Amino acid sequence: VKKIKSKLNAKKFSEGNFLNINKLLTFFIYLLIAYAIFSVFFVFISRLFFPYQLEWMEGGEIEHILRLLDGKCIYCPPSLEFIPYIYTPLFYYIGIPFIKIFGVNFFSIRLVSILGFVLLLSTTYLVVFKTTKNKFWSFVAVGLLAFSYSTTGFWFDLARVDTIANLFMLLSFFFLLDENPKRNLLSAFFAFCAFYTKQSFISVHLFLLLGLLIRDKGLFSKHFLLYFSLILVSTIIETIRSNGWYIFWNFTLPASHYWIWSRVVTFWSIDLLPFYSISLALILGYFFVQKDELFKSKEIYFLLFLIGTLFNSYFLRLHYGGYLNVLIPFVISISIVLPIIVFRFQQMFNSKNIQTILLTLVLVQFCLLIYDFLTPIPTQKDKGEIEYLLNNFRETQGDVYLMGYNFVQRYIGKRDFPHYVLVNDLLIANLKEKESFEREFIYSLKTHKFSAILLDDDLTLKHLDKYYYKTDKFFYHRVFNTKNVFRKEVVWLPKQKDYSN
């Protein structure tokens, strides 16, 4: 009897120890969640009013909105006056009232993204809480997403389409989970909004449609009909308004981009595994254990959400021009699925020591995402370097072509020209639609239309070196959406030889 009592007391003591450890681990995880949320919004506020671009294509988003406000079509034949970004237009339409209310500046459009991110975090919480009814694990999802600010290129607050597109994607997923007729239609509508903001999100939704087909064919047919009807109608309207250029810019030209095959490996070895290896291991382990039950529950949606976002992020990262922002959809799915499967593991094992292991792994996962939140914040020195660059060109007579900039040329009274990325995309493409623009561009170089051209030192541009020469004059400044990277931008001037004939 004494031996049995001593064993029982030892077991109680052991469980008590594990309970105290688990409380401590939970406390530390809450601290990291608070730190993640504080740091991301501290950066947002610190960058919101910065008057220059935080990322080299931010200004182009404003130029698109201004063009719409002037009553002009954004999907037009390419020219030195304007070349559109290769995105569907909903983000620009959303930006119009913000520009009207807050003025023509970066603040107005960054505010769109920041508000979108607040809603994105809220929806992330709601998706996990709907599934687990557990506040702690719902906050874990929010913390993981907030901490992913660094791994996705400090992108959430930029005046770019991504945060809003991802918000629509997640809202669609949230309503899809209910398997309710009315909410099913809301899901289809928000899925269309994601497509109409960034067309590549159709790939994510196709996987979710497969889950709906498996679970409820009646809901699937209505969802499918509404979703693709909205896509078809919007595509027809935009194509008619643009005389067919909507199709070219959003589908034909992106399809012509080449692939960066080295990223087949680096997507995993550099972009994901150093930061999310614990999450991916736990998620794979759970779905392997539950493989026989997946098709019997709503968990099939989470598996297909993971696969769909992985496909989307992987495909775009391999594509020419795919930066770290393309990881956001997959990072959102990891942030949501990890706390849900850890919660499920707790239910499956119902053991304090297993819970300790799981909480420890989650804590380590958070630690892998810690970053220096001062890195992406522009300093006075950064601001001064950009102003020094602009002031140099303010004094230059005639047109200057700042190829890595849009909108900021207005600050120095200079005309805006298409961004380098857009010009280069066209010139390297084997498409007949570029021919008129290429002739115009060659003629502008040949006749020395530009008094000076500014181009990143590590970039090349077809035809440029035939009519302009690279000088020793350069500007050097920090990039705010990449860790410890600087841009060296070199001035090109017209060659003396007369090409006018």
Predicted features by range, described:
Residues 151, 164-183, 189-191, 333-340:
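Specific aromatic-rich, kink-prone transmembrane helix
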Residues 87, 242, 361, 365-500:
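Extracytoplasmic
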Residues 175, 184-212, 229-234, 309-315:
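Membrane-interface alpha helices of multi-pass inner-membrane proteins
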Residues 31-34, 111-132, 140, 171:
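Transmembrane-helix motifs of polytopic, lipid-linked glycan transferases
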Residues 89, 93, 101-122:
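Loop-to-helix entry region of an early transmembrane alpha helix in multi-pass inner-membrane enzymes
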Residues 59-83, 90:
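Extracytosolic helix-loop segments that constitute the early lumenal/periplasmic catalytic or substrate-binding loops
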Residues 114, 203, 319-350:
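Hydrophobic/aromatic-rich transmembrane helices and adjacent perimembrane loops
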Residues 124-148, 166-167, 182-186, 248, ...:
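Transmembrane-helix signature of polytopic, membrane-embedded enzymes
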